[in-house]
């Protein structure tokens, strides 16, 4: 275990890989060498990082299957990202979590739509009652002669009893 996580050992293996690659591919015009070296370095680092991580996870975890599955999925997703793919591998647990989240969001939307529909129905009922109260009915001709100021229209002779009712009267009071 110490040998797996030892930094000097890892660096010496990387140096050994690089020197081996240099000796194999001595042609200076080799254009793909940096890419091959970086991919091999990443693969080696993943190999060195994943084995101790999985061993520790299996020893400390009660649900070892889920941990191993999660580690493997994470490693494959990392490799896919390095290869340039945008897709990722998902487990059934993640799909179920996403489905639950979507269903919960849909339920919340349905409740909101139900509340809004209920409010709309109440508002329509209220508007109907207001309309019924304000309903305009056709009425025959209304006599407006008592409603207008007759002082401006009639002369003194045309008033009933010959007196203008709007003139101030003199009132005497007994003491």
UniProtKB/Swiss-Prot annotation:
Residues in the Lumenal compartment per record: 1-28
Membrane topology according to the record: Single-pass type III membrane protein
Matching Gene3D superfamilies: 1.20.5.430
Complexes and interactors: Homotetramer. Interacts with the immature particle in the viroplasm. Interacts with host CAV1, early and late in infection. Interacts with host integrin ITGA1/ITGB1 heterodimer. Interacts with host integrin ITGA2/ITGB1 heterodimer. Interaction with microtubules blocks trafficking to the Golgi apparatus.
One matching Pfam family: Rota_NSP4
Transmembrane segments: 29-51
Domain notes: Binds 1 calcium ion per tetramer.
Keyword terms: Activation of host autophagy by virus, Calcium, Enterotoxin, Glycoprotein, Host endoplasmic reticulum, Host membrane, Host-virus interaction, Ion channel, Ion transport, Membrane, Metal-binding, Secreted, Signal-anchor, Toxin, Transmembrane, Transmembrane helix, Transport, Viral ion channel, Virulence
InterPro entries cross-referenced by the UniProt entry: Rotavirus_NSP4 (IPR002107)
Stretches of the chain found on the membrane's Cytoplasmic side: 52-175
Residues bearing carbohydrate: 8, 18
GO CC aspect terms: extracellular region; host caveola; host cell rough endoplasmic reticulum membrane; membrane
Post-translational modification: The N-glycosyl content is primarily Man(9)GlcNAc, with a small amount of Man(8)GlcNAc.
Superkingdom: Viruses
Subcellular location(s) per record: Host rough endoplasmic reticulum membrane; Host membrane, Host caveola; Secreted
GO MF assignments: channel activity; metal ion binding; toxin activity
Family note: Belongs to the rotavirus NSP4 family.
Binding-site list for Ca(2+): 120, 123
GO biological process: monoatomic ion transmembrane transport; symbiont-mediated activation of host autophagy; viral process
Function: Plays an essential role in the virus replication cycle by acting as a viroporin. Creates a pore in the host endoplasmic reticulum and as a consequence releases Ca(2+) in the cytoplasm of infected cell. In turn, high levels of cytoplasmic calcium trigger membrane trafficking and transport of viral ER-associated proteins to viroplasms, sites of viral genome replication and immature particle assembly.
Name of protein: Non-structural glycoprotein 4
High-level lineage: Viruses, Riboviria, Orthornavirae, Duplornaviricota, Resentoviricetes
